[in-house]
Amino acid sequence: YRQHKNPVFDFVQRRGRERHNRDASAIEREDVRAKLKVLRAGRAIWYAPDQDYGRKQSLFVPLFGIQAATVTATTKFARLGRAKVVPFTQERLADGSGYRLVIHPPLEDFPGESEEADCLRINQWVEEAVSALPEQYLWAHRRFKTRPVGEPGLYKKRRKR
């Protein structure tokens, strides 16, 4: 969880999340100990493994044939938290009435032998999910923003307003 700069929006977002899950708690994204404590208690945490969080805690592995900075946190949380990785997808319903949530089986034999193999496996899973419903993916997210050293950027520079 990252607090919003706008305190009113932050309040509205937190209230909305807590309304649907009284046991939900927003854990600051840097608070690894709190996340591990939750996992070891048999509860769940959520984060998006398909986001570009930069190179600090990432490895470059292919996603749709392009090297992508992929977080190693999935492996670390599964190992240190003694937790299963349970992927899910959500689909906006055509009539705009809501979403269909699909909770998939836990990844078997995860974590594996190496963080790199695990990152590749996560990206392959993301590829399959996105390919099934490409119109549902958040393509506006600059997934390939962080490039391997020496590789040029893939996005046009944004103009400052």
Model-derived features with residue positions:
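Conserved nucleotide-cofactor-binding alpha/beta core module
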Residues: 1-43, 54
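Non-catalytic C-terminal accessory region of glycerolipid acyltransferases
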Residues: 30-161
